[in-house]
Amino acid sequence: MKEIENKKMYYFVDESGDPNFFNKKGEDLVKKGNVSKVFILGYLETDSINIISKNIQNIKNEIKNDHYLQDIPSVKKSLLHLHAKDDCPEVRQIVFKAIEKMNIKCHIYVARKDSNLFRKKFNAKQSKFYEYMIEKLFENRLH
């Protein structure tokens, strides 16, 4: 029988896309193209939080000390808060190369947004849709 490891794990949950399907008037925002056609929910799992924190600080130092990047307006914001949608491609490349070396696991769940299915399965309630996404994301993952 395999012995259970006793180590502390850390989970960071994030989403991408807009979970909305309809506006307040009941108009289908997905069909109109006013919101994303997919909604993604994911998490990062690690037991190396201190190492990852140091790596992120090293990334910020590398960006701060790169003379080429200093003239890019968005870099000042990146030094405070890294976020792929706001960071310039050069910063994203530095971050992605560093992520490859980190001790992390990522799990994602992607939903294609279908307004008819949303009405039938979730009674057009965003909270039920989000709850379903969370359940699917963590299904058979946490013990």
What are these regions (language model features)?
Residues 1-143:
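Phosphate-ester processing/binding pockets and catalytic centers
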